[in-house]
């Protein structure tokens, strides 16, 4: 049996069940475990209650139960500079960003990893549903989590080989119900705590209200592709490509009484385009351009590959051809895709392995730009 007692693992603990079980499993495997709670956002609500305080109490309770030391570290400045400013800039540009991808890259596996190293960590661990496997050459491959419904490799796709070399995902081989069961069996304080939803820093708040505190909304016209005026929109940033509802035009007829969807945006003219039908022709595209292209291991500067891709979380994989040039790439779809959204991540897979990904800049239909920003 391996003696793990000399290997120090610093666990990012959020006060949720996943990170609690992560710490428990590592402790049971004999590692030298330290828990760290990251405070990334000042989330005091209108009643003066800070949810982070409640979460930290849960971290403390679990750490005491499993007998590990724990600390709290404040990354509010790093989060603001590296994640939130990016988030706002993307919305200003008419795009729909994915802050979780950036949060993992810049905070959970950079700021936190650096901090863990000052505590003498050999590895960091989180409660993400993903797996890491080291090959005979010492290269770490990131594989999907065993629980298909919970697999989080989409959000981890910007991690580097250096980051993965120092990372453990103890829940990767488990199904979510098994994780709850382990927590309940061990009597952990967080065993019955519900999973958090929403963007990491907004939590359960009203998204529209939250965004309007930072970006003034500019109302404008809402139109069909053929120029019919459908009324007023509340601000382009509140709408995402492919969105159904929320436009206030549900009762308006046309087409075959099909529901209305957001099918395009024109940032320069401040126009929101809407159309009827889930598969409206303006929502379909055949290729995309992406930037911030990144792979989890060394790849040539310029190459072409066939693989599968996801264009949003929990979506089935689609076959694609990827042409990479530096940190940019063209991704050509084997079948037309719906609602490819600038600002979202495109993530590449080879079977179970997550190869990396990039951020979608523009979608095209047969070589012609889709009016999505």
From Swiss-Prot:
It is an enzyme of class 2 (transferase). Residues 150-152, 312-313 are annotated as: Interaction with tRNA. ATP binds at residues 12-19, 38, 127. InterPro entries: MnmA-like, MnmA-like_C, MnmA-like_central, MnmA-like_central_sf, Rossmann-like_a/b/a_fold. Residues 98-100 are annotated as: Interaction with target base in tRNA. It catalyses: S-sulfanyl-L-cysteinyl-[protein] + uridine(34) in tRNA + AH2 + ATP = 2-thiouridine(34) in tRNA + L-cysteinyl-[protein] + A + AMP + diphosphate + H(+). Keywords: ATP-binding, Cytoplasm, Disulfide bond, Nucleotide-binding, RNA-binding, Transferase, tRNA processing, tRNA-binding. Its EC number is 2.8.1.13. The active site is at residues 103, 200. NCBIfam families: PRK00143.1 (NF001138), trmU (TIGR00420). Catalyzes the 2-thiolation of uridine at the wobble position (U34) of tRNA, leading to the formation of s(2)U34. This is tRNA-specific 2-thiouridylase MnmA. It comes from Streptococcus thermophilus (strain ATCC BAA-250 / LMG 18311).
